[in-house]
Amino acid sequence: ESSAASDVYKRQGQKIIQDNGYIKADEKAPAYKSNGAKGKVVVGGSSSVTPVMEKLKEAYAKANKDVTVEVQQSDSTTGVTNAIEGTCDIGMASRDLADSEAKKGVKATVIAKDGIAVIVNKDSKVDELTSAQVKDIYTGKTTKWADIK
């Protein structure tokens, strides 16, 4: 695991994550101390992770003057693929790894969690949905509101 990737777990990184509207992944993260790293780190992938990664990049740069962090925004699949192929050092994804991706030797590390809201029309008789019901709607298993019980 790269130093830059593990540093996101440090107390300062988790505070940045929380300050940007995400849920911290590690409530007990230790304080970060620079290890004197030098060079360039390329981070690429998910557009939904990019804003918080830019904030983490700023904080990391302050603590590590000899490191350049380049953040490339695309999508989760591109981020994972580029990490597998070595085009980037850290891939950003806003989803779990597919089994086929995990088999290629990359490791997923959750740095934050975000909330997703499902909004229903005000005239709908449905006023509450379970996660299973939302899944069934989006996978096509449930196609009629009348089937929601």
Regions from the language model: what does each represent?
Residues 8-9, 30, 37, 117:
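Hydrophobic transmembrane signal anchors and adjacent membrane-proximal interface regions, especially
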Residues 14-42, 142-149:
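N-terminal hydrophobic or amphipathic helices and topogenic motifs
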